[in-house]
UniProtKB/Swiss-Prot annotation:
Belongs to the aspartate/glutamate racemases family. NCBIfam families: glut_race. The keyword Kinase does not apply. It catalyses: L-glutamate = D-glutamate. The lineage of its organism: Bacteria, Pseudomonadati, Campylobacterota, Epsilonproteobacteria, Campylobacterales. This is Glutamate racemase.
Length: 255
């Protein structure tokens, strides 16, 4: 089975990593709209247009399924993309909510949603969680993480300063943290470490990772089995510098 993975840049590598590990598919076409990253600071109309243009990119590749590996596009463009597509299109928000439903039984557990400004303002996660009965939901736009990750700044003083800026004002310590941008799993270990060190937690918060969640969702939805295929063939494309994108992929995914 040949599928497509669409992201605003390199954040979708976190989803791609989970897909490669699961070996559910034969071939994966990855498209990063790196010339227009970040999506999280742009308006909904623009993001919808970017999503439709991504569909145009994938048409000649004859994929059978498209994964929108971008929370901002999933929140604001997914429905419009589905209207204009003959193949199934899966976003990352629904699978993440399903993962929480399966793993978090306490409806009063404090849940923190991290995301870009556009994702947070869409209320996509807040509304979906409330529909499932989760009552203690807060959110935080952490958009500065995206350019740091795009620049491969995954640790060090600059990232620490950024986390301190965002997390110090928190009044309620979360038991669950939704990494509501596919860039964020690339610094998941650092986020977990920050909470453990600065808030003196005995156990780390549960981190919900879009990549792992979407693998579980695809297995259930399409009756796919892990390791059913050989290691997938991966082809990279970008609206910007594809050589740079491939270099980042080789470093982060160990290809």
């Amino acid at each position: 089975m040949k599928i497509g993975v669409f992201d605003s840049g390199v954040g979708g590598f976190s989803v791609l990593k989970s897909l490669l590990k699961a070996q559910l598919f034969d071939e994966i076409i990855y498209y990063g709209d790196s010339a227009r990253v970040p999506y999280g600071t742009k308006d909904p109309t623009t993001i919808k247009q970017f999503g439709l243009e991504a569909l145009d990119f994938f048409k000649p590749h004859k994929i059978e399924l498209l994964i929108v590996a971008c929370n901002t596009a999933s929140a604001l463009a997914l429905e419009e993309m589905q209207k204009h597509s003959k193949i199934p299109i899966v976003g990352v928000i629904g699978p993440s909510i399903l993962a929480i439903k399966q793993q978090v039984k306490d409806k009063n557990a404090p849940i923190l949603v991290l995301g870009t400004k556009a994702t947070i303002q869409s209320n996509a996660y807040d509304n979906a969680l409330k529909q499932q009965g989760y009552l203690n939901v807060s959110h935080l736009a952490t958009s500065l993480f995206v350019p740091l990750i795009e620049e491969n700044i995954l640790e060090g003083e600059l990232l620490e300063t950024c986390m301190r800026y965002y997390f110090t004002p928190l009044e309620i310590l979360p038991e669950v943290v939704i990494l509501g941008c596919t860039h964020f799993p690339l610094i998941a270990h650092q986020i977990e470490g920050y909470f453990m060190e600065h808030f003196a937690l005995s156990t780390p918060p549960l981190l919900i990772h879009s990549g792992d969640a979407i693998v579980e969702y695809l297995q259930q939805k399409y009756a796919l089995k892990k390791n059913a295929c050989a290691f997938p063939k991966v082809e990279f494309h970008a609206s910007g510098d594809v050589v740079w994108l491939e270099k980042q992929a080789k470093e982060w995914l160990k290809l």
